[in-house]
Regions:
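N-terminal export signals
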Residues: 3-20
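Catalytic-site microenvironment of enzymes
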Residues: 4, 18, 28-30, 58, ...
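Serine-esterase "nucleophile elbow" of acetyl-processing enzymes
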Residues: 18-86
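Alpha-helical cap/lid subdomain in secreted, periplasmic
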Residues: 56-57, 76-203
Length: 203
């Protein structure tokens, strides 16, 4: 293991105020975006998905690990192979299909928890993305995050990007259908993610 790799294995350090401080990602660093159709970019033209837009905005090499229709269990099964690409950051945005299929919440929590554990075992920082839950409010155009994401972020002490998918999917101008963004919606998500990573000192 060389010095550069050692620094990345020690990327998350305690700051003086008791929070978490992240070593800045060099340009061209590999980032894995793991998810479902919202990551794959369903509802927008090719290369208008949020990982592509995030790469354009940041200079990072963002791998689109989104597969339309994937549940948390299916994404978990794909994760080991994706981690072999040696990402320096993993973004996890998954769970919408679990909710639509009414899978047990306990199973979704367990699967996402296992993903986080797997990534943390490789000493890679995680950004967990909150996904809206199917409620009457969502049907009326006012989606809100499922609380399990906040719970998991606290349990595993990982970064949480909250409210962004809910905001986008609650705006008719930013979505292609009830559960997918359009090109502008994915651009907006990438912009919010880039701003979030800058505020955390990651880029």
């Amino acid at each position: 293991m060389d010095r550069h790799d050692f620094l990345w294995l020690s990327a998350v350090l305690l700051s003086g105020c008791g929070g978490r401080k992240y070593i800045r990602l060099p340009a061209g660093s590999i980032v894995l975006a793991l998810g479902d159709s919202l990551t794959a970019g369903v509802g927008a033209p090719r290369h208008a998905d949020y990982p592509s837009r995030l790469a354009e905005m940041t200079g990072l090499q963002v791998i689109n690990g989104g597969v339309s229709g994937n549940t948390s269990g299916q994404a978990l099964a794909r994760l080991p192979a994706l981690l072999r690409q040696n990402p320096k950051l993993v973004i996890i945005s998954i769970g919408g299909n679990d909710f639509l299929q009414r899978q047990p919440e306990s199973a979704t929590r367990e699967n996402i928890g296992k993903m986080i554990e797997m990534v943390q075992a490789a000493s890679i920082p995680v950004v967990l993305v909150a996904v809206p839950r199917p409620t009457v409010g969502a049907l009326l155009g006012m989606p809100s995050d499922h609380p399990l994401y906040g719970d998991l972020a606290k349990r595993y002490n990982v970064l949480l990007l909250k409210g962004v998918w809910a905001e986008i999917l609650g705006d008719e101008r930013l979505k292609s259908d009830a559960v997918h963004a359009n090109a502008e919606g994915y651009r907006r998500f990438a912009e919010k993610m880039a701003d979030f990573l800058r505020k955390q000192g990651i880029i």
